[in-house]
């Protein structure tokens, strides 16, 4: 009898314990899962950091080759929230990707029209492309400063403001690859890889179209117009991507590499006689006033195949000379050529 009462007591206690365990509105396992999810969300927000970013190039020289500047990798502990940008191509890419947090830009007279909104007072003025306002930049307390060739001489001084100074510029002899490298920097650092892939897909599609178009012509020449004078560019130049990436065949490779091209007389254009003649209007880009058609379409040029077959392609000066190196501007260049030659 005593044993029977003892068993009843044990079963009663077990029932109370089981009821207590099952009485919670939310199972203990679910509670643990919720806590785990919160931890995972926190981890996701910091995924990829610390992140080491490499410059688009590790060194560059000034125009006369007398000085060499070396650029270092930068390790970021988190996504930069206060961004200062000198390079307009990189600003173009940040704008295309919808990156927020830009606090300062170079408010130079050469600020591209499609980036005009950054001239507003809400964006701090960090000087010109050649003359940074170091004290004003320091006052912005940036987490990162993005530079290109014209600021190379100020690299060490800018690093005194923040160690996070990244070279994102393009270089003449490897323009397209350095452009893509700069896009990769923006996409990874600001978690915009999906947006970058979408934009690059548009560029790839446009490149396919322009390469197909370029197959129709055997020779071409890229030139730049400046106050009545012409200079020419081949594959080893800042506009070499017209040949290498767009697919146009150069009429000659024998042109000295220079950021402003090799001086050409109009007679040289007639001698080369390219089927397509590209003319970038530097005068319009720099001064806003240009007599390009009157100067180019002279009696000598009127004898060329390009003139006779209406294939002198006048390219937008501000876009080609001052802009470029960004997602929006590179797509716009391709679309301009397509519109002129289709």
Protein language model features and the residues they cover:
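Bacterial N-terminal signal peptides that target proteins for export
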Residues: 1-8
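Bacterial Sec-exported substrate-binding components of ABC uptake systems
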Residues: 6, 22-89, 194-221, 287-291, ...
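C-terminal motif of bacterial Sec signal peptides marking the signal peptidase cleavage site
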Residues: 17-20
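Structured C-terminal subdomain patch of bacterial secreted/periplasmic proteins
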Residues: 82, 188, 275-342
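A short, structured surface patch at a secondary-structure boundary
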Residues: 82-136
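Alpha-helical, coiled-coil/dimerization segments enriched in small aliphatic residues
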Residues: 109-114, 234-261
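Proline-aspartate-enriched helix->loop->beta-strand connector
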Residues: 141-147, 163, 269, 273-277
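Extracytoplasmic substrate-binding proteins
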Residues: 157, 161-227, 320-342
